[in-house]
A protein has these predicted regions:
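Asp-box/WD-like beta-propeller blade repeats and closely related beta-sheet repeat scaffolds
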Residues: 6-39
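Loop/turn-rich, solvent-exposed surfaces of beta-rich toroidal or solenoidal domains
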Residues: 89-92, 96-97, 103-142
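Blade-level signature of beta-propeller repeat domains, shared across WD40, Kelch, NHL, RCC1
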Residues: 158-188
Length: 188
């Protein structure tokens, strides 16, 4: 499922090509989406309040989770921990961890994470986070300890904003601002 930043959520099938299966109309602007079990978590921002909305198959709202720093902007990206007990999101220069009820567990900041954007997590809970302005991808433990800079401008990054980890092939896909290319890096 993907959001278009508008009033629809597109359900797509991913194989060698993307195939749109159906569209779901929603009310309000949604900026991100995650899926677990039969539930969607949506990042909704109405210009005043940023909220994570948990919805059962997009039919019924199960829970609304107010997001810290909601007065600044919508979160740039978010993902769920592998055990689905935590929500990780980026906002400004921060990586924030909430429990599934919205309680803030930790906030991570680093000079290596300026303009925090895209975020993903591996099956061990290690977070991979893009710093658009620092031109980096860093690794952070679930406890909020930085493991290091994985990729930087020395590796050809320029304003990384989106990241996806394919654990089956040990590949990281990165999108960059003002580029229509997807960069692929293999983890060794």
């Amino acid at each position: 499922a993907v959001t278009t930043g508008g009033l629809r959520i597109e359900i797509v099938s991913v194989s060698s090509i993307l195939t749109k299966l159906r569209s779901i109309s929603v009310y309000g602007d949604y900026y991100g989406i995650a899926f677990y079990d039969t539930n969607f978590i949506l990042d909704k921002y109405d210009g005043k309040q940023n909220t994570f909305v948990i919805s059962n198959e997009l039919k019924k709202v199960i829970k609304r989770i107010p997001v810290p720093y909601h007065d600044r902007c919508p979160s740039d990206a978010f993902c769920l921990s592998p055990d689905v007990h935590s929500i990780y999101f980026t906002v400004e220069d921060r990586l924030v961890t909430l429990d599934i009820n919205g309680k803030e567990l930790s906030t991570f900041e680093s000079d290596d994470l300026e303009g925090a954007c895209g975020i993903t997590v591996d099956k061990n809970g290690i977070l991979y986070c893009c710093g658009e302005n620092s031109q980096t991808v860093i690794q952070v433990t679930p406890a909020g300890r930085q493991l290091g800079v994985l990729l930087s401008s020395d590796d050809g990054l320029k304003n990384p904003i989106g990241i996806c980890l394919n654990t089956k092939n040990n590949v990281i896909l990165i999108t960059e601002r003002e580029s229509d290319e997807v960069k692929m890096f293999r983890l060794i």
